[in-house]
Design a protein with these regions (language model features):
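Short coil-to-beta-strand transition motifs
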Residues: 76-79, 206-216, 280-281
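RNA pseudouridine synthases
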Residues: 1-188, 192, 197, 300-316, ...
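Conserved hydrophobic positions within beta-strands
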Residues: 84, 178, 218-220, 259
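Short Pro/Gly-enriched beta-strand edge/turn motifs at strand-loop
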Residues: 64-67, 198-202, 213, 265-271
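Short, acidic, Ser/Thr-enriched surface-loop or helix-capping motifs
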Residues: 37, 215, 240, 290-291
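Pseudouridine synthase
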Residues: 109-121, 153-157, 166, 191, ...
Length: 337
């Protein structure tokens, strides 16, 4: 994915955002820019902007995430099983398994969640606001992050769900196991996040004026004692108020408590990572008011077997649960000691 950064000049003030971007070198056509805006790929002054009619102002800092080019005709239906937790005429809440890429990209031409959604719903019954090569996708999970995510069956619902993310009214909570003992039981991490200048695969905390604001709150659920191989662990629930690429993984590394098993931001020590071959990160709960019916929807997802096995192995080393842990851990499907 390429990044474009633009500082709006005085003589451009007042132009519509889609028209302004479409006239800039390096950006696609105006209509394509409109799709990028509606898909959440454009930020103004660090905040995602979903309105193509936004009138740019002198000094605005605009960032555009350009997806890698991909032929949308490649999104063919494939009979990949979907673990659906809620479905109606407008949207789907599903649990994504580890190893499943959300949409086709270079190196992953098929076998993606998008291919599965096209098979399940039909290409004409999925939102295309994110682009025709990302049918139905409202928000993404990293390939090896498991758990709950949303898909939309039409453009209006897709826009409405993305607006819930923008207005921070889509409640998304994740479970992660991190290295070390986090001293405080709860806290908030509020930083800018931008692509790393050292490694373009990674994201990094940044004070660059074009960085996007990222807010994560966390609650420690349980701590586990240290050994000669590791510094102990903390089981944590993270609440996303924004949805930046690798946000939880970057924020946990930023406070010196990287996610266990994380190949990009972690310690890369097999013993300290409890033998995991992927980051210990699971989207366990989503809650929101249905954008069409108004019904309150809440779905929960127990930990998959590989993550649950790690916690079962660590159970004898438990230093005790917090009040939040007493509430949440029993809902994760773990074996009780």
């Amino acid at each position: 994915m390429a990044d474009i950064h633009i500082l709006v000049a005085d003589d451009a003030a007042g132009q519509r955002l889609d028209a302004y971007l479409g006239a800039n070198d390096g950006c696609p056509t105006r209509s394509a820019c409109a799709h990028l805006i509606e898909g959440g790929a454009v930020a103004v002054n660090g905040e995602t902007c979903l309105s193509k009619k936004y009138a740019v102002r002198s000094g605005d800092r605009i960032s555009v995430d350009l997806p890698e080019p991909h032929d949308p005709t490649d999104v063919i239906p494939e009979a990949i099983p979907l673990d659906i937790r809620y479905e109606d005429d407008y949207l789907i809440v599903l649990s994504k398994q580890r190893g499943l890429v959300c949409h086709p990209a270079h190196g992953h031409e098929s076998g993606t969640l998008a291919n599965a959604l096209v098979y399940h719903c039909g290409i004409d019954h999925l939102g295309t606001v994110q682009g025709e090569d990302r049918p139905g996708i409202v928000h993404r999970l990293d390939r090896d992050t498991s758990g709950l995510m949303l898909a939309a069956k039409d453009d209006d619902t897709q826009r409405a769900l993305q607006n819930l993310i923008r207005t921070r009214t889509l409640d998304r909570r994740y479970i992660t196991l991190v290295h070390g003992h986090i001293a405080m039981d709860e806290g908030t991490i509020n930083t800018g996040i931008a692509r790393s200048t050292r490694d373009r695969v990674k994201m990094a905390v940044s004070d660059d004026p074009f960085a996007r604001q990222a807010i994560t709150t966390f609650r420690v659920l349980e701590r586990f004692d240290s050994t000669r191989f590791d510094d102990g662990y903390s089981l944590v629930e993270c609440h996303l108020f924004t949805g930046r690429t690798h946000q939880i993984r970057v924020h946990m590394r930023h406070i010196n408590h990287a996610c266990v098993g994380d190949p990009l931001y972690g310690k890369c020590d097999a013993r300290a990572d409890q033998g995991l071959t992927r980051q210990f990160l699971h989207s366990w709960r989503v809650a929101f008011d249905h954008p069409v019916t108004g019904e309150h929807i809440e779905c929960r997802d127990e930990l998959p077997w590989d993550l649950a096995a790690v916690l079962d192995d660590l159970a004898p080393r438990s230093l005790g649960r917090t009040a939040a842990g007493d509430e949440i851990v029993p809902q994760l499907g773990l074996l009780e000691a």
